[in-house]
């Protein structure tokens, strides 16, 4: 079989399946279910790299991990939020398509940049250029929660937030990468 199936990529695969469940939830009109899946995908993405770093991997396994993570991110943090917003406001189709395109470009840029970075150093990444697409796992759930709390309309504010977020994906400002201390995780 093509691909890699060790524990270093399993959480990425799980995150993708959770994201796909979120797309189905959004298409079925279950906004809360879609938001919860978006958050679940975000949790999987938060830890998949840390888990992968615990294993000595071949260069092919490392490159596969980068690619599969970005493909999963496109579905979970590009397509899922776009479907979620489109379901709440069907007049936002072009905006949602543009958001997915911006997420795709941002992820492709990251992959090229990460490959070049890894050719020069094995140090951990300290910053990103442009807003990482994974921030969608925080932005849209917070927006949804605020709208529930203040009884506002997700269908009105979500497209505006989506436009700003998509623009931030491609704007070359620097974002410091949060680092959490890795305790009790040994290399295998």
Predicted regions and their residues:
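Topogenic membrane-insertion module of multi-pass membrane proteins
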Residues: 1-49, 168-188
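Cytosolic, membrane-interface loops and tails of multi-pass inner-membrane proteins
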Residues: 47-63, 110-126
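Short, amphipathic, aromatic/basic-enriched membrane-interface segments that mark the entry/exit
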Residues: 1-10, 61-70, 123-130, 180-183
């Amino acid at each position: 079989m093509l691909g890699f199936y060790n524990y270093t990529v399993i959480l990425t695969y799980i995150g993708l399946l959770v994201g796909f469940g979120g797309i189905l939830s959004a298409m079925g009109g279950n906004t809360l279910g879609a938001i919860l899946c978006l958050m679940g995908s975000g949790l999987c993405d938060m830890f998949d790299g840390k888990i992968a770093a615990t294993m000595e991997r071949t260069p092919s396994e490392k490159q596969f991990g980068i690619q599969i993570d970005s493909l999963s991110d496109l579905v979970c943090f590009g397509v899922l939020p776009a479907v979620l917003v489109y379901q709440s406001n069907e007049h936002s189709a072009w905006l949602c398509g543009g958001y997915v395109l911006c997420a795709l470009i941002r992820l492709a840029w990251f992959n090229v940049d990460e490959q070049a970075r890894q050719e020069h150093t094995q140090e951990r990444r300290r910053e990103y250029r442009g807003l990482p697409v994974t921030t969608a796992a925080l932005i849209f759930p917070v927006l949804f929660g605020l709208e529930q709390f203040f009884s506002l309309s997700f269908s009105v504010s979500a497209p505006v937030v989506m436009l700003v977020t998509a623009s931030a994906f491609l704007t070359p400002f620097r974002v410091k990468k949060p680092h959490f201390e890795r305790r009790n995780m040994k290399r295998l």
